[in-house]
């Protein structure tokens, strides 16, 4: 099976998993993501949430998110709640991002391997979650882990054909950053970002961002099918 077909199948499995969770726990929207070695989310799969809203989150609000995996890496937490105390301590995030997007409560599910967070699922709703529903999220976690186990294979480093700057840009693409955000964070021009991406596409034999993310998601055994 090609890397792209395998990635498409994995995405479908995860999307189905999100849909199943939404049937067990009524949701407004949900997001699945992998967590890289820097504890940053990447490879997002969205359920009932617009690309514009997601991009707004990435560009303006992600650093303010109190439920980021990095806040829970030294704990054993597998389900985290957006408690009233957290809302009060993170008023800007709650009032400027959550409420305008009709999100009044969030529950975060963390998927771990040997205690390290390797993936997560954000559950969002326009009404508060009950304690029973949060317990249900905790109870469904083993089933989620089993369902997506094969989708969470370990990755090797990017091919040596990429420069350090190109690998950095690929990492940002996988985290969902737009060209504009990449340019701003790396302090380079937008045209330079586009030039880097063209070179990356040529070296990795892909034609767009989606294929790039799919290919770099695959373990080395799958990646060699394209070399």
UniProtKB/Swiss-Prot annotation:
Endpoints of the signal sequence: none
Gene3D superfamilies given in the database record: Winged helix-like DNA-binding domain superfamily/Winged helix DNA-binding domain
One Gene Ontology biological process: regulation of DNA-templated transcription
Name of a matching Pfam family: GerE
DNA-binding region(s), residue ranges: 179-198
Location of the HTH luxR-type domain: 155-220
Record InterPro entries: Sig_transdc_resp-reg_C-effctor, Tscrpt_reg_LuxR_C, WH-like_DNA-bd_sf
SUPFAM superfamilies: C-terminal effector domain of the bipartite response regulators
Stretches of the chain forming a coiled coil according to its record: none
PROSITE patterns cross-referenced by the UniProt entry: HTH_LUXR_1, HTH_LUXR_2
MF terms (GO), sorted A to Z: DNA binding
Keywords in alphabetical order: Activator, DNA-binding, Transcription, Transcription regulation
Job description of the protein: Positive regulatory protein for the induction of arylsulfatase synthesis (maoA), tyramine oxidase (tynA), maoC, maoE/F operon, and atsB/A operon which are all regulated by monoamines, and included under the common term of monoamine regulon.
PANTHER family reported in the protein's UniProt record: DNA-BINDING TRANSCRIPTIONAL ACTIVATOR DEVR_DOSR
This protein's name: Monoamine regulon transcriptional regulator
UniProt organism field: Klebsiella aerogenes (Enterobacter aerogenes)
Lineage: Bacteria, Pseudomonadati, Pseudomonadota, Gammaproteobacteria, Enterobacterales
